[in-house]
Amino acid sequence: MATSRTTTDNAATIADVYAAFGRGDVAAILDRLAPDVAWEEWDEPTFAQLAGVPHLLARTGPADVAGFFAVLGSYTVLDFAVLDIIGSGRQVVAEVRASFALPGGGRFADEELHLWTFDDGGRVTRFRHYSDTAKHIAATRGEDTTVR
């Protein structure tokens, strides 16, 4: 008899994904993705996507998502902390605090929500950032959005 995945299983998977991110183990993260994973895909492009923010561009499939991690690899991580992980059915939300310095001199610090959606087999089928995209756009343009 097959067992179905639970919200707890999916939340544990996301905790493992963030642990892999902390180790720089991109392969372990990509292993958790469905072949057709929709990464930052929305019904309409977001303002950040229209502005060309490289880490918020829409991507499809693990090979394309690897490009997201290549972009992050060019950034300096100043702070990254998972504050909470909350699950409901096929979806898990992670509350994170993130601060990065970008190659062009821009910086951003933000508290974000990351929405992860799963299939029945426990693979991630969709990922979306919910963040202050104005900060991300400004940082991509070389601005330091951490200065008040």
Identify the residue ranges that each predicted region occupies.
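Short, low-complexity N-terminal intrinsically disordered segments enriched in polar/charged residues
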Residues: 1-35, 144-148
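Short, mixed-charge, low-aromatic patches
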Residues: 20-29, 51-54, 71-73, 95
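Hydrophobic pocket/interface hotspot
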Residues: 14, 29-30, 37, 61, ...
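Short, flexible active-site loop motifs that bind/organize anionic cofactors or intermediates
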Residues: 16-19, 55, 75, 126
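A beta-strand edge to alpha-helix "cap/lid" segment located at domain peripheries
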Residues: 2-9, 70-148
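Hydrophobic alpha-helical core bundles mediating ligand binding, dimerization, or RNAP-core interactions
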Residues: 14, 18-21, 33, 65, ...
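A solvent-exposed, acidic/Ser-Thr-rich amphipathic alpha-helical stretch
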Residues: 35-89
